[in-house]
């Protein structure tokens, strides 16, 4: 399968192939991040000390929401792996201070969600 596919248009946007598992992961990540957008805003707002949500950079918001999607909806990826991946992405696409900001909020949310049972990881070695 191609990276992006439309039922109406079978043209490839990228000339490389991904496995069905990678395609499922990508679709889940995209669809859940979009559909849970307002829920994620409500989860993030209380963790922003001395900041208004509308003042946070768009890329930082997106990266945090994608990480939350992995925490909640992708049971095969450990939370620490998700955090590290999004911190690495922030180094490339955001400001130098964003890394600490993203890490602090994700760490607080991860611990809170683990305690409340919202994060459930499955698979060998994934139960943290």
Predicted regions located by residue number:
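Short, small-residue-biased leader/transition segments that mark boundaries at the very start
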Residues: 2-3
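C-terminal non-catalytic interaction appendages of large macromolecular assemblies
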Residues: 53-65, 75-128
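Long, contiguous alpha-helical segments
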Residues: 9-13, 43-51
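Amphipathic alpha-helical elements of HEAT/ARM-like alpha-solenoid repeat scaffolds that form extended
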Residues: 23-31, 60-68, 106
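Short helix-capping/linker segments at secondary-structure and domain boundaries
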Residues: 7-8, 72-78
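Elongated, mostly alpha-helical coiled-coil "stalk/stator" tethers of large membrane protein machines
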Residues: 8, 18-27, 45
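Fold-level signal for large, globular catalytic cores of enzyme and receptor domains
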Residues: 36-37
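C-terminal subdomains that position terminal phosphate/3'-OH groups for nucleotidyl transfer/ligation
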Residues: 15-20, 63
């Amino acid at each position: 399968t191609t990276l992006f596919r439309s039922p109406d248009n079978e043209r490839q946007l990228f000339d490389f192939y991904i496995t069905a598992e990678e395609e499922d992961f990508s679709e889940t990540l995209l669809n859940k991040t979009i559909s849970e957008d307002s829920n994620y805003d409500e989860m993030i707002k209380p963790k922003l000390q001395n900041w208004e949500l509308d003042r946070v950079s768009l890329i930082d918001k997106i990266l945090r929401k994608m990480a939350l999607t992995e925490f909640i909806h992708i049971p095969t990826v450990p939370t620490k792996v998700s955090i590290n991946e999004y911190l690495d992405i922030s180094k490339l696409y955001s400001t130098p201070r964003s890394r600490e900001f993203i890490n602090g909020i994700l760490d607080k949310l991860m611990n809170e969600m683990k305690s409340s049972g919202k994060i459930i990881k499955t698979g060998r070695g994934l139960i943290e």
